[in-house]
């Protein structure tokens, strides 16, 4: 809705004419006379008065309003036409029938402005004239003709008429709008055209106390309410006022008391027409050349005048409408009282069959009351208002209907959702179809019991239910799809972990080729439609997510199994395998330093040869392992993992680098420290073994202890023990265990010596130290006694 307000005034009824070149003026032509005869010479008049071929370049403007309100004066001042105007000394009807005139120029703030388009103006006989009295037939038909053939309909109204019903011609407009809807409504539905008519409300004699915006709001509200109350055909009930009309406003001051302001308001209205061109829109035009419009106007008048389907309401029908409306209102109020009594509370678990029967009884009671009072009036009106009552009752019952239907749907949807979760992805798509079909059938059956045999539509309920089902299924599909992805990633992670652990047993140049081959074996098998009924896009997204997570798992598992600590332990184990044990897996005994140094170098080399293999994932062809996705990209991690650590963005990552150079140096330093300690320990044991007792000492012992040896030989007990000891030594020598046995014996002896020294130190300790300890013990005992006494 548009507004335009001048600084304006109080009733303009006298003729006022802006001087214009009289040679440009053309006499108006009466296209419909007061006896309802149509003038077929319109086209000749237009061709004669127009300066050039009109074609489609024209606009039709008409004026509508009460008699003697200055309609003709407004047109003459604005469009520089020469319609007859009322003699101010004698208020009586001036315009009879409908007149048409060509506008040579339009009055604007720039002066007389020539329009780019040809403007044809129709002056329509005023309404509510004393000459016609109660005969409103012509004024209704004339108003309908103007509305049907014009692009812009000027409704000329005094400020004091705004808010009135009869004074503002609302009753007449209602009748005209009803017939207009019947005439053009079906055409609009069939052709889907966007044709409209602009209602230009010119508020005359505007004092300025009430703002134009307020007047416009009141008048627009009256139009909307009037449209809502129209008796529309069933197929046209959904059409709105805005589908047929646009509304804009313009206010004019009093022509006599404020002539200057009145003229300025006229000029501003002219600006809106031809300067800014805001009032002429393509959808207002009938989109036919001028000769087609004249033919259309003639056919339109014939249909309005003669077609019985468009007969305007008679007084009898008007009375019937009024009385039937009263009866409908009374019956509906009685229905509402019963409605409130029965449906004060909503039953959580109703019997739908009983509820449907109650609906039918309430409605039938209302129909019987209506029929008893309204059936004596005009049958068409009676039936029409009965339909209105039916619609009112159905609309009210629909409230309870919707509540129970919604509760039923919610209950069944909860069960449906639990059933979906219980499927755990097994035959998901098939079971979803079965469950959803059963759910819709259950709702359809239960709700139809209270639908008044289909009068209360199930379409919205079923549509909403279907959307809810789709939403629940879509949600569960995502859950199941994520579950499949996560389970597959776990399976891949377990397989990858086993593969890496196996390769760590004996790493070599083909280690990462084997790991990658095992990874790709599981990685590339993932795919398909998953049997969830998901779209190809969702399936592809799931595959992408699986692959991204798989590479993340590759990275995480390798770093978990090959950490600094585990790498150090692995190097030590490989070193010990060569340094402490021989090829047969038996403990190795070193008898000289040369053998120790040689074995130490071999063991150390054996351990360190896997360090470059395990710290950087490189294939046999020299290339590093590169993932299909940049798993360190924050956007990808957000997309596939749902979040990421901002601190990771500050670090430079290399997928193939398992141990950094700094960590590698730390591991190498710790490894060297550990193996060097083992080397020194082993070397010390060799030195101890070599420096024990010289061999010649054994010869001296043999010479000096000959008698003792002989005594042992001659003694059966000692001789037997010697035989057993000798046999044991021989067996150990034969089995190759003599050296290990000697080492064990030597270490046992060393431990015995250490323990003996400790005991001897305790025995030989100074007496004063012993005495001191005893005194300390006594003092402690005394304190304990005192504390106990306390």
UniProtKB/Swiss-Prot annotation:
Residues 55-284 form the GB1/RHD3-type G domain. InterPro entries: G_GB1_RHD3_dom, P-loop_NTPase, RHD3/Sey1, Sey1/RHD3-like_3HB. The chain crosses the membrane at residues 693-713, 717-737. Residues 714-716 are lumenal. GTP binds at residues 65-72. It is a multi-pass membrane protein. Keywords: Endoplasmic reticulum, GTP-binding, Hydrolase, Membrane, Nucleotide-binding, Transmembrane, Transmembrane helix. GO terms for cellular component: endoplasmic reticulum membrane. One of its GO terms (molecular function) is GTP binding. The keyword Mitochondrion does not apply. Its EC number is 3.6.5.-. It holds the Pfam family Sey1_3HB. It is found in: Endoplasmic reticulum membrane. Residues 1-692, 738-790 are cytoplasmic. One of its GO terms (biological process) is endoplasmic reticulum membrane fusion. PANTHER family: PROTEIN SEY1. Belongs to the TRAFAC class dynamin-like GTPase superfamily. GB1/RHD3 GTPase family. RHD3 subfamily. This is Protein SEY1.
